[in-house]
Amino acid sequence: MLNPIVRKFQYGQHTVTLETGMMARQATAAVMVSMDDTAVFVTVVGAKNAKPGQSFFPLTVNYQERTYAAGRFPGGFFRREGRPSEGETLISRLIDRPIRPLFPEGFLNEVQVIATVVSVNPQVNPDIVAMIGASAALSLSGIPFSGPIGAARVGYLNDQYVLNPTTDELKESRLDLVVAGTEGAVLMVESEADLLSEDQMLGAVVFGHDQQQVVIENINALVAEAGKPKWDWHAPEVNVSLEQRVQALSEARLGDAYRITEKQERYAQVDVIKADVEAALLAEDETLNAGEIQEILGNVEKNVVRSRVLAGEPRIDGREKDMIRGLDVRTGVLPRTHGSALFTRGETQALVTATLGTERDAQTIDELTGERTDRFLLHYNFPPYSVGETGMVGSPKRREIGHGRLAKRGVLAVMPKASEFPYTVRVVSEITESNGSSSMASVCGASLALMDAGVPIKSAVAGIAMGLVKEGDNFVVLSDILGDEDHLGDMDFKVAGSREGITALQMDIKIEGITREIMQVALNQAKGARLHILGVMEQAISTPRGDISEFAPRIHTIKISTDKIKDVIGKGGSVIRALTEETGTTIEIEDDGTVKIASTDGEKAKHAIRRIEEITAEIEVGRVYQGKVTRIVDFGAFVAIGGGKEGLVHISQIADKRVEKVTDYLQMGQEVPVKVLEVDRQGRVRLSIKEATAPTQEAAAPSSEE
């Protein structure tokens, strides 16, 4: 029979429930986690044995949202969920990052975590719930895992930190920070902020880590009650004699290779050394495993780099720990784009463009809680040539989506409001060279391209990636890390911001024991680096250009009465469609009567404004208009007097004498002066030609149909 085991606890303003033993009993472990009506069902399945020849840890995390969770149908023709959305991909990465370092080294069994959102309260974001569920399921499974972890979202409202703010609170918050960690250490931080100080950001990380201890305590209690036995897994035995032999053959040569500052040359030399060592050892003993030799070589390589850094020696490319690579900053590099920049930092380079569009260019995002529109898009592309390789080119991968989102977080806080700058903005970062921190190069390039495009951003922003090498109590924080330093180090710490404060912080830690002191040193060192980069960027362009590109659409805004909106749109959109075709502009009308006319040609925009003013103008009784005959009937003629308005000239109002046949006096398309006699309650207009042509009449008002 089903035997659910439940833990319930208070977590900030929410009640969290952990339940296991009820569903998916054939999975290695399964947990239903709910937080005030938002429920995520998380399963873990682990393979008992690693595949032969497996050389990496095959962990996959899939986060998936079901529309039934919000009582909705999926969009699209098939009315079924399809490939993961960008939001689902980002949350999958958010779950993956803090759990991956907690699996033991040498554990190569396949593990799959699937988190399915099955119920959603619009005020409670499912991401934290899913992270708690993944932690609980892995802890229950018996799979070798040094957890559990806790997860918390931290907001900053009225100068106070808020634990797990609601969706409404988050809209007003100056901070959106997610922190995850074990009982003793922070492992992951992902955040965007409205120009907060280093101390405020560090305080938020510590606050979130302190508050999430209640999650860890309750997961441990659930494991004590319902956990499966720990797997009898042991790390593969180390071949000490082979390690010593590999070290003797390679250590000195790898040390020399890592004094080569040029990346491609260094990589080529390292590859030669590894091939030589492998060949020499296999010549001595054919029974040795080539994969094992390469793994040991990787460890020797790691130790060579780390020991040099800890000893205070120059880094791989000859820099000191807090030095930034050489910078080259250029703007306006592409002639027909609306804004462009080329940002180069050492061997990392980003070509970044900014494109301005109208509101209809905004992205409509179909989320669980409904649709929303995004007026600022930032896309990051990482082609294989950027690292001198060949590879598949196609739709963006998880890494590209994640890096693009981080760069967007870095720029978002300085973007102007829609009321100040009514454009949709798309920034694209093409990584043309990469050797560390291409996402932060994208932040710098985006800031430059936006300024070049004339987007009135509040201030320039720059980003920097920090690294860490730590052995015992000895640690060194590195500024502007290379790709190798990221791979061989203990921390990847990315900070973006302006001179005023931080806009984005992302931290991934591979080891336990990162203290508040280390984070403080990293943040302060990052500030110095950020200010240095901003100084160089400001030499290229210090303020946004005074005008947008001649190739960008210019948006003109006018206001009309809300009861005139229907007149401008017309039946089935006929009037606005005709206006768009006639004037060659893009016209958007909002519910409050705001009309936006976009065109690259100023004269066309003015023409469209004139036409809209004519359409929305009130018809004055007694005024003479120049009109055009549109229909002839037995009892008179209908005459258009502009603005899509039409009136009837009765047969008795055509001439001073008796008219037997209307066509004797009027033809289709003929232009005639008409005087407005009356507008009745239903808006019908009565016109007269004979009164308009009387000698006493003033000159006719021009027709909009001319």
From Swiss-Prot:
Q: Which residues form the KH domain?
A: 553-612
Q: Which GO terms describe its cellular component?
A: cytosol
Residues involved in Mg(2+) binding: 486, 492
> Which compartments is it annotated to reside in?
Cytoplasm
Single Gene Ontology BP annotation: mRNA catabolic process
Q: List the Gene Ontology MF annotations in alphabetical order.
A: 3'-5'-RNA exonuclease activity; magnesium ion binding; polyribonucleotide nucleotidyltransferase activity; RNA binding
Cofactor(s), by name:
Mg(2+)
Entry keywords, A to Z: Cytoplasm, Magnesium, Metal-binding, Nucleotidyltransferase, RNA-binding, Transferase
Identify the EC number(s).
2.7.7.8
Kindly state which reaction or reactions the protein catalyses. Answer: RNA(n+1) + phosphate = RNA(n) + a ribonucleoside 5'-diphosphate
Which PANTHER family does this chain map to? POLYRIBONUCLEOTIDE NUCLEOTIDYLTRANSFERASE, POLYRIBONUCLEOTIDE NUCLEOTIDYLTRANSFERASE 1, MITOCHONDRIAL
Q: Which HAMAP family match?
A: PNPase (MF_01595)
- Kindly state the subunit structure of this protein: Component of the RNA degradosome, which is a multiprotein complex involved in RNA processing and mRNA degradation.
* Protein name (database record): Polyribonucleotide nucleotidyltransferase
Instruction: State the organism named in the record.
Output: Pectobacterium carotovorum subsp. carotovorum (strain PC1)
